[in-house]
Amino acid sequence: MDVADSTSETPPVFDHDNLALAAQTNLLQFYLTHLASTLVPPMKLDMRDSMTPSFSQTESPNSETDDSTSAANKVLFSILGTPTTDSTSNAVSKSSSKLCSVCGDKSTGLHYGAATCEGCKGFFKRSVQNKKVYHCSQDNCCEIDKQNRNRCQSCRFRKCISKGMLTEAVREDRMPGGRNGNSIYSNYKQRRSIIRKTKDYVEEQERRPFQSLPSGKKLIKELVEMDCLDRLINLKGLRINPSANCDIAPACKRLTRIGDEIVEQLVEWTKTLPFFDELPVEAHTHLLTQRWAELVLLSAGYYACSVFTPDSPDTTEMIDETDEISFTNPQVNLRLLQNRLSLVLGKEIPLEHVAKEAGPLVTRFTTLLHSFSNLKVSPEAYVCIKAITLLHLSADSTLDRSIIDKVNTLQDHFVKTLQIHLHQPGEDAQTTSLAQILDWLPDLRNASSVLLHSKMFYVPFLLCKNPRRLVFDE
């Protein structure tokens, strides 16, 4: 039956029953497994490849497996290189999670730029918000641990700063006096400058890992040069159906497999990152599995903001023939999605079907676009945010503790690199603060869950890129 002749039946493009593993919580496993039949044999990346196990590259995505994560890991191992250790043997219990970098208590995550417990997080936040200035009676040499962390506030705050906690990351609008308060308390800025000149800090910097990583502008330049945004936006699965009356099935098949193409592009991008060789392959696998949906939305959002001009917040009228995505009106974007989806499929897709299946995703993506456009992110800030997003570990990560430490250290490095960039003077100086960007990241995370639930991974790209203007290197 012609899709245009009926609004009661669900168009094939919205029928996801043919995805054998679509019911799994993490759809990435399906796509990674399917990639095994389409990718070339493992690339020789370095000396570790001499130990490469023989992985099958013909596994069917419909075959049952006792461990879908293991199957997915095999595919990523074949793309990224050889794991240095068995990821299973490196798994640790939740009870052995990372410790607070300030007092050694159990860490609850990354707070203001450092992995800390709730106690040190709250102490740091209150100190900055209340503009406290502490003094030590013991020459600033008090030991700070779980038992005596409350004995000397001065040394505790000093250690917070030395471990990378950022006063700039504390919300300005929660400061006494609201947003009119100073974003960086001058006393803290002065004290931080003094601390960084101390012998202890210099020795700590000399001992820090990842000495091979470039720093500052050089690191950002490498990230900009290696970014795969053009390839990620110009997805082959979004080609226009050449005939207006041809079978809709092949186009639907391309769209349902577009996750393959997305993951492959993200894997290739990961291999170009300056810190690729600093982490074992199982860490890259774990990070991509957790964060690929966020990277999709971030990339599509930045592309839209760099190509289109955000519309007025007062825009409420439906624009029937618009060729631009709206940053404020989900209804405009639903109509845009309907037009472009019909163009790709060669069949008219009823608007009510698009609204029913993609409405929540389009609404959330529009909201995300609006908030992201307000940040006015530069290309340099975008690539830093992208690296920070990839390196964000969940609290229940099962990676080996030593790997978790490395990932957190790397993320800290990119947070500080972003901070330095945001404070660069000049004509192109950023008006956005680090705190504003950190506040936006949870919105990105929440939107990614809607994308995963919808299974329509092509929607952000189809909204941001007119399929008539796709460019391929062939």
Curated annotation (Swiss-Prot):
Zinc finger intervals, NR C4-type: 100-120, 136-155
Which terms does the record give in the GO molecular function aspect? nuclear receptor activity; RNA polymerase II cis-regulatory region sequence-specific DNA binding; zinc ion binding
Q: Which GO terms describe its biological process?
A: cell differentiation; nervous system development; regulation of transcription by RNA polymerase II
Subcellular location(s) of the protein: Nucleus
Annotated Polar residues bias: 51-69
Q: Would the keyword DNA damage turn up in this protein's UniProt record?
A: no
**Region described as Disordered:** 50-69
Tell me the ranges covered by the NR LBD domain, including all copies: 215-474
Q: Which residues bind DNA?
A: 97-172
Q: List keywords of the entry alphabetically.
A: DNA-binding, Metal-binding, Nucleus, Receptor, Transcription, Transcription regulation, Zinc, Zinc-finger
Cellular component per GO? nucleus
Concerning InterPro entries, the annotation shows: NHR-like_dom_sf (IPR035500), Nucl_hrmn_rcpt_lig-bd (IPR000536), Nuclear_hormone_rcpt_NR3 (IPR050200), Nuclear_hrmn_rcpt (IPR001723), Znf_hrmn_rcpt (IPR001628), Znf_NHR/GATA (IPR013088)
For the keyword Nucleus, the answer is yes
Coiled-coil residues: none
Q: What does this protein do?
A: Orphan nuclear receptor.
Q: What is this protein called?
A: Nuclear hormone receptor family member nhr-91
Record gene name: nhr-91
